C-alpha cells in the first residue's frame, strides 16, 4: 500500500524492497531518523539468532547509505537487550547491540559522529536489583537500565560540511536556526511515550529534536521502521517532509491515520 500527501509518502511493505525502488527512482533523503526492531525483545522481531539480526541491520542500512545524500546524518535509536535465561541453572545475558552496531555501520561506510544517551525515569525500568537489595552481596549487583542510545552517523562527503550549509538559501538558514534552549550535552532526559498502542514507541520529543538539530526546513526525512509514525509527526511539527516505511499492516494503518491528521 502507498499513501501520499503534500508533504509525506507512506509505504506499507518491506523496507529493503521499498528503499530499493526509491533508489532506482533516483530519490534521495536529507536525514534518517529511525528505531530498528529490538532483537527478540518485542513481538514483531523474529530472527533465529543474533548473527541473523546483525546481518538484517547490515542489509537495511546499506540501502539507507545509498539513499542518503552525501554529508548527511543517520540517527538510530538502539538499546542493550536482555536475553532471558532458559532455566534456573542458566544466567540471563545482556546483548550490547548499540556497540556492535557501530562496527556494522563503519563496515558499510558510515562515519560515527555521536552517541546520545536517552535517560528515562527510574520507574520506567524493569527491576533488576531485587536480589541485591535483599542480600547485598557485591557480585550480585545489577543496576536498573534506564537508558537507550541514539547513535548518529554521517555519510562521508568531499570537503567540509559548510558546503552543505551554503546550499541553502539565507531564508532557509535563518528559519531553521535553533532558537532558545537546546540540549547542551549528550545525555537527554526524556520521558517515554505511555499512551501509544505500539509496543516500543518513540516519545515525540526525541525525533523532533533530532530532526531540528540535523536537518533544515523542507528537507526530506526517512524512517524505514515507521511504527506508530512518531517521526512523521515530528516532521510536521518542524516543517519537514517525510518518507515512512512500515511492514506491519496494523502499525501502518495506525501511523497513516496519525500522520494524515498531523499534516492537515
What role is predicted for each listed range?
Residues 1-254:
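Core catalytic lobe of class I
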Residues 250-264:
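Cysteine-dependent PTP/DSP-like catalytic domain, specifically the C-terminal lobe
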